[in-house]
Structure formats: C-alpha cells, structure tokens
C-alpha cells in the first residue's frame, strides 16, 4: 500500500481549492511586485503600516550589530537575551498585566498556552470559527473539547453546564475571516460565573482596537480578571514577527515550566526583538495611524455598500466580500488582478463550504486614492462574474 497523493491533489484542483504561493519580489506594503507584476495589494496583515518602516529597519540593523543574527539556544538554556526581556516588559506594560512571555509565532503561543493549562480530565470550549491554531491546540490538549456557536454566550453557557475539571473558554478577539469581534463582556461573564478562565487570541485586534492600540480587551475596558489569558501576535500590526502571552505572574511562570512549544525551541533573533520594541513605540505614539485606518474602513464600506456588495458586520481592517461559490471568488480575484489589484480569494476549508469570499484587508499605509481604485475596479469587475465562466487563476 502506498500514499495516493496525486488523487488528493487532483481532487483539490477539481474543486477549485488548490493553492499556490505567490512570489513577493518587493518589500511588504500596499504597492508590491508579485511574480514580476506590479500590484496594489489589499491582502496583508500589516495593519499599522510598520513592516517596512525605516525606523524599525534601523532598529533591526542596530540590534544585529549589537546582538548578532541568531538566538543561539532556547530561552531556558542561554537564548533569553536582554532585548527579549525588554520586549516582554514593554508588552506587559502595553496590556496592563504583570508579565508577558515571547513565543516564536502565534501558532506556538496558542498551542503552548492551551496545552499547558488543560489536559485529560479538563474541558476546552471554543468558538466554532476560531483560528485553526486554537482548534488544533484544543484537540491536542487531551482535554474534553467542544465548540460553541459563533459568538453565542447562550451556546457557551449550555456547554459550561456540562464542563468537567479546569475549564478554558477560548475565542479569537477579531475573527480573521469575517472581521467581526468577540462579545467579550458576555463571554467573560459566562466564564466567570462557572469558574472558567477566558483566553483571547487578539492577533488582529492589537493595533486597530483600543485607545492605545492595546486591542479588544482595552476596547471593552475589561480587566485581567475578565480575561486571564491574552495572546497577541507581532507579525501583523507590529510589522515584525513572533507572538506573546500576557497575564499574571503565576500564568507566565506556568507557561515557562509547562508550555512545550516555548521550552523546546530556539529563541527568536534578539535583533528582531529590537525591531519590535521600536514598532511598539510607534504603534503607541502615532495615533494618526489608527485614525487614518478607521477612515479608510469607513470609506471602503460606504463605497462597497453603494455597489451592492455583500459585506460582513465588521468595523475592523478585515472586510470580506461574500461571494459563496469558490470558482466565482477565484474569478473575481483574477479579474481584479488583471486590473493591477491583489485581493485574495478565501475558500474552504479555511471557511465553511458555500461561503467563499474576497478578503479585503486595509492598512494605515493605504491612501484614500488606493481605496478608491479598489472600489472602481470592483464596480467594473463584479458584473463580469455572471458574464464569464469561472476559471482557476494562477494564484488565489
């Protein structure tokens, strides 16, 4: 018996679900070169426009001169350097919590936190639309795992009634494919009433949300008692790479002792932490970035609604255009690309069957003119969906 990989791949192609990697040949930003083609991109997560900021680049260069280019060891051996520690302290200050702990990426942070906190005999309850890393973490934890209806505190309450052992309620802060935000006050109230802990992965909330960019917890004015476990990523609004968990002294010490994805990996380059310290400073001080981004979101939504496009209930930089059929979503993405715009088609299994969409993401680095170009292209391209066959584009 052998692995029949070709049949699996062919099935993906037939269902318009086959994925290919675009080759980015320029720095990240609104104006990019992909596979040799200049494009105006609306598909990255650089919400604050810091991924190519000259001060962040200079901080990385200076960090490399001072600290070298590699972490060299795991944090618990000799890989925890001064820049790592300073960044953890700055992230703790941003979130208003005693401690923060750096991870190499968001997947590892989520996996590490969930599996360190619950196991056999415990319960994990997750929103059914959570990010794949959270769902994987729940399954791999060994705890009893159940998903409640999307953003539905009543559905969560019904599952809390059946929970056993230590119970961890897990949700995205901003849902990455829909752009809506979790009803944290209701979820926190439900969790606390049953003695459960609430864990929030706010990967897409840090930066755009909150008066100081501290995310959805700041947006709702909640405390560490409401949300004991707060996760953030550094590869989106911070413009660099990595992730963190913020919480109490006891939580962070527990993760240091028991979070295997933290313990058994080499630390990120110290120079990267230097760059993130600079981007964090810019995120907190340059409030115009959040204000400009909010203005662009409003501009896009008004224009898209005038065109009759079906949007999701989102005031975040994630603005999906619902299409439904995967082939039609691919076709619209290709039509836009032919006009010099890059907007990714999102298809199953990333989203449920029948809910394929174009996922527009906006950045503080975009201009009003950029958004207007997108709206004009959508006005031209959307009617063409019914006038042509759905074909598989080169990339989507």
UniProtKB/Swiss-Prot annotation:
EC nos: 2.3.1.47
Keyword hit for DNA repair: no
Entry's family note: Belongs to the class-II pyridoxal-phosphate-dependent aminotransferase family. BioF subfamily.
Biological source species: Pseudomonas syringae pv. tomato (strain ATCC BAA-871 / DC3000)
Binding site for substrate: 19, 131, 350
Keyword check for Transferase: yes
One Pfam family, short name: Aminotran_1_2
Molecular function per GO: 8-amino-7-oxononanoate synthase activity; pyridoxal phosphate binding
Positions of pyridoxal 5'-phosphate binding: 106-107, 176, 204, 233
Protein name: 8-amino-7-oxononanoate synthase
């Amino acid at each position: 018996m052998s692995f029949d990989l070709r049949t699996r791949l062919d099935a993906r192609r037939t269902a318009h679900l086959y994925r290919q990697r675009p080759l980015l040949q320029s720095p990240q930003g609104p104006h990019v070169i992909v596979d040799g083609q200049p494009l105006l991109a609306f598909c990255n997560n650089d919400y604050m426009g810091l991924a190519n900021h000259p001060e962040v680049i200079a901080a990385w260069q200076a960090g490399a001169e001072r600290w070298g280019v590699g972490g060299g060891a795991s944090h618990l051996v000799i890989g925890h350097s001064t820049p790592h520690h300073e960044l953890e302290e700055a992230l703790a200050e941003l979130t208003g919590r005693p401690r923060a702990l750096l991870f190499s990426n968001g997947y590892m942070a989520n996996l590490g936190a969930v599996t360190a906190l619950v196991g056999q005999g415990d319960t994990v309850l997750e929103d059914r639309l959570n990010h794949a890393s959270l769902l994987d973490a729940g399954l791999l934890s060994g705890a009893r795992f159940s998903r409640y209806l999307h953003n539905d505190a009543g559905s969560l309450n019904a599952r809390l009634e059946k929970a056993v052992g230590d119970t961890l309620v897990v949700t995205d802060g901003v849902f990455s494919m829909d752009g809506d935000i979790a009803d944290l006050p209701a979820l926190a109230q439900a969790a606390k009433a049953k003695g459960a802990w609430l864990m929030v992965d706010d990967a897409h909330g840090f930066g755009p949300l909150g008066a100081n960019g501290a995310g959805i917890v700041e947006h709702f004015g909640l405390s560490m008692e409401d949300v004991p476990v707060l996760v953030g990523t550094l590869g989106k609004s911070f413009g660099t790479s990595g992730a963190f968990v913020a919480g109490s002294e006891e939580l962070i010490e527990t993760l240091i002792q028991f979070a295997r994805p933290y313990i058994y990996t080499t630390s990120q380059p110290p120079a990267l932490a230097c760059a993130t310290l600079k981007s964090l400073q810019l995120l907190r001080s340059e409030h115009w970035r959040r204000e400009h981004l909010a203005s662009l979101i409003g501009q896009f939504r008004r224009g898209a609604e005038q065109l009759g496009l079906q949007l999701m209930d989102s005031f975040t930089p994630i603005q999906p255009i619902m299409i439904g059929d995967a082939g039609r979503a691919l076709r619209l993405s290709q039509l836009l690309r032919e006009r010099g715009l890059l907007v990714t088609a999102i298809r199953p299994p990333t989203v449920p069957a029948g809910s394929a969409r174009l996922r527009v993401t906006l950045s503080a680095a975009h201009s009003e003119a950029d958004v207007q170009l997108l709206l004009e292209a959508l006005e031209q391209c959307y009617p063409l969906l019914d006038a042509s066959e759905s074909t598989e584009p080169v990339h989507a």
